[in-house]
Amino acid sequence: MAQELKLGYKASAEQFGPRELVELAVLAEQHGMDSVAVSDHFQPWRHNGGHAPFSLAWMTAVGERTERVQIGTSVMTPTFRYNPAVIAQAFATMGCLYPGRIMLGVGSGEALNEIATGFQGEWPEFKERFARLRESVRLMRELWLGDRVDFEGEYFTTRGASIYDVPEGGIPVYIAAGGPVVARYAGRAGDGFICTSGKGMELYTEKLLPAVAEGAAKAERDVADIDKMIEIKISYDTDPEAALENTRFWAPLSLTPEQKHSIEDPIEMEAAADALPIEQVAKRWIVASDPDDAVEQVKAYVDAGLNHLVFHAPGHDQRRFLELFERDLAPRLRALG
């Protein structure tokens, strides 16, 4: 059965402090969003004006203040500064508190967050980071069965470990992928798949989504059962100049993947990002002041097969964005589903 079209809100933990970020999630539910997803950074991508509240504390606060939205990370790295057994316990607890509403979105990690918190040695290449991710997911799922777990992995070990409070069925795990290797893994092992917009439609139509389908087929799964989430970078405002200028804070998104994965210091990240021209920064975003134009650009992702659209707005006035989204974009987007 095909997944229904869902509209979500990206809570930008790099841009807002914890109390404001909770209030924005509450507003997102009030404005009709189906989900709220939060980034999980120890350090932001900007030193000046940046924030980095702890995602799990935020999720619990949002759970207490909301009634229906799905709440999750997009994304967390459960492999370096975190012990995946403890992450499994934390998410199981939230799953008991807010049944059916919690998801865990995971990725392979960035040096910015892990080296500051004590990772020693050379930052690992993709092969090791991916192996750690797979092993952590396997361990967390074993723990969510509620049994005593003796786990002997290459990177993680448990001895008679049990999680005593686990929601029935465990916690859905969403795998973030920027290329076909991890996308195949998402199809094979993920309850959901996460990607981000603005990288050329052929990436989604020719690489990522076919890889998800290939992974699902190899695991004898129905790819239609996998929630296909995309973070859509959208700067929508009825004022065209504001729509363009609002992207400036998020210039780090326009750095190369190598820069984003290897830069260790937010001051260095900020300097590299601020050297970029606004035109290059804006290329990662749907920048629009006409609602039909905005929805037409989003529609391409729906047509590609992505069903869970999580909207990341770059401006500081998120209340305005949520009001405009509900008024101008949501009705048009719902009609696509």
Curated annotation (Swiss-Prot):
GO biological process: carbohydrate metabolic process
Positions with a binding annotation for coenzyme F420-(gamma-Glu)n: 40, 77, 108-109, 113, 178-179, 181-182
GO molecular function: coenzyme F420 binding; glucose-6-phosphate dehydrogenase (coenzyme F420) activity; oxidoreductase activity, acting on paired donors, with incorporation or reduction of molecular oxygen
Residues that, per the record, bind substrate: 196, 199, 260, 284
Active site: 41, 110
Annotated catalysed reactions: oxidized coenzyme F420-(gamma-L-Glu)(n) + D-glucose 6-phosphate + H(+) = 6-phospho-D-glucono-1,5-lactone + reduced coenzyme F420-(gamma-L-Glu)(n)
Keyword Isomerase on entry: no
TM region positions: none
The enzyme's E.C. designation: 1.1.98.2
Record key words, sorted: Carbohydrate metabolism, Oxidoreductase
Domain of life per record: Bacteria
InterPro entries in the record: F420-dep_G6P_DH (IPR019944), F420-G6PD/mer (IPR050564), F420_G6P_DH-rel (IPR019945), Luciferase-like_dom (IPR011251), Luciferase-like_sf (IPR036661)
Segments forming a coiled coil: none
Matching NCBIfam families: F420_G6P_DH, F420_G6P_family
Assembly, per entry: Homodimer.
The family this protein is said to belong to: Belongs to the F420-dependent glucose-6-phosphate dehydrogenase family.
HAMAP family referenced in this protein's UniProt entry, alphabetically: F420_G6P_DH
Free-text function comment from the UniProt entry: Catalyzes the coenzyme F420-dependent oxidation of glucose 6-phosphate (G6P) to 6-phosphogluconolactone.
Name of the protein: F420-dependent glucose-6-phosphate dehydrogenase
Gene source species: Rhodococcus erythropolis (strain PR4 / NBRC 100887)
